Structure formats: C-alpha cells, structure tokens
From Swiss-Prot:
The gene is nifW. The lineage of its organism: Bacteria, Pseudomonadati, Pseudomonadota, Alphaproteobacteria, Hyphomicrobiales. This is Nitrogenase-stabilizing/protective protein NifW. InterPro entries: NifW. It comes from Rhodopseudomonas palustris (strain BisA53). Homotrimer; associates with NifD. Pfam families: NifW.
Length: 112
C-alpha cells in the first residue's frame, strides 16, 4: 500500500527522473539480482515500457499507478531472469542480428 509521502509526487515523474535501472527498482520497491540487471538493464526497461504501453493508467490514483508500474517491472525483470536478452530480442538489432536457423531449401526442380 502507498504511504502518504509516496502520493505527493507522481511515480511516473519519479521514474522519468531516475538516472539508472537500479533507481526504477528502488522507487518501485522491487527486489532484484544485480547480476541480472547489469547484463540486461536496458532490455528490462525497454520491456517494461512495452508492457506499460498496453496499460491504461488514466484516472488512476498515484497508489494504483505505482502498483501497476511495480507489477510491470516485476514482469519485465522476470523475463530476463528466465532467459537472456538474446532469447528475448527486445531491440531491433538483436531481432535482426541472429536470425533463427531455417531449414535448408531444396527446389523441386533440383530433384531428379
């Protein structure tokens, strides 16, 4: 639950001012493994942004927004605890860099 001091400044404003991924975790009260964050900090925050984009936060209290943001950060973080940034392919450069292997193509007219 939110305390009165947490409701004075919008959590979105606090996150906009955050200078590091660790500040996101601290602001939202999410526990994390520093090793996971060191490897995937940008990926986690990008995924959090993707998840937040699908949330409707309009008209919610700051406490409700904080809880939603916390849940979204936990979900994004869990994605990278369970797998690597390369597996998740959040950024276009990773999506394009290593394409999944395709089966060999043999045209029918090559078979005789």
């Amino acid at each position: 639950m939110c305390s009165p001091s947490e409701t004075k400044t919008s959590v979105i404003d606090q996150l906009k001012r955050a200078a590091s991924a660790e500040e996101f975790f601290t602001t939202l009260g999410v526990d994390y493994d520093p090793q996971v964050v060191n490897v995937a900090r940008l990926h986690i925050l990008k995924r959090m942004g993707q998840y937040l984009a699908s949330e409707d936060l309009a008209g919610l209290s700051n406490c409700a927004v904080t809880e939603r943001c916390k849940a979204v950060l936990e979900r994004a973080y869990a994605d990278f605890v369970a797998s690597s940034p390369l597996d998740q392919r959040v950024f276009k450069v990773l999506k394009d860099a290593v394409s999944p292997k395709r089966g060999a193509f043999v045209p029918l007219d090559a078979l005789k």
